[in-house]
Amino acid sequence: MNDLITLAQAHCQPREKKEHKLGQARLAELLPQVPGWELSNNGHALTRTFRFDNYYRTLAFVNALAFIAHCEDHHPDMSVHYGRAVVCFSTHKIGGISENDFICAAKTSALYEQGI
């Protein structure tokens, strides 16, 4: 990925081979670029909880995120609750985290910051 392009502006690329799984050094480099996200599932996923005033806003966010996931062809695991949504990105085909997960995490954070 070109370092001049922010994660939120980048687009997902096919990443189906084990060599696309990010190592610890690259994870440490990218994690500060997605504030609020943390490594989960023993370092195999990125997770963040988003909080909302009510269930309607939670579902509006989840539906908007579904559209982004569809456009990027990279889909998170989500759990939806009253006033919060937990979003978890992982590249299942490689058994860990790829740059696609960071791209989608950044896009998800940008969506949240827009007040959706």
From Swiss-Prot:
It comes from the Bacteria. The keyword Lyase applies. Transmembrane segments: none annotated. InterPro entries: PCD_sf (IPR036428), Pterin_deHydtase (IPR001533). It catalyses: (4aS,6R)-4a-hydroxy-L-erythro-5,6,7,8-tetrahydrobiopterin = (6R)-L-erythro-6,7-dihydrobiopterin + H2O. One of its GO terms (molecular function) is 4-alpha-hydroxytetrahydrobiopterin dehydratase activity. HAMAP family: Pterin_4_alpha. PANTHER family: PTERIN-4-ALPHA-CARBINOLAMINE DEHYDRATASE (PTHR12599:SF0). Belongs to the pterin-4-alpha-carbinolamine dehydratase family. This is Putative pterin-4-alpha-carbinolamine dehydratase. The lineage of its organism: Bacteria, Pseudomonadati, Pseudomonadota, Gammaproteobacteria, Lysobacterales.
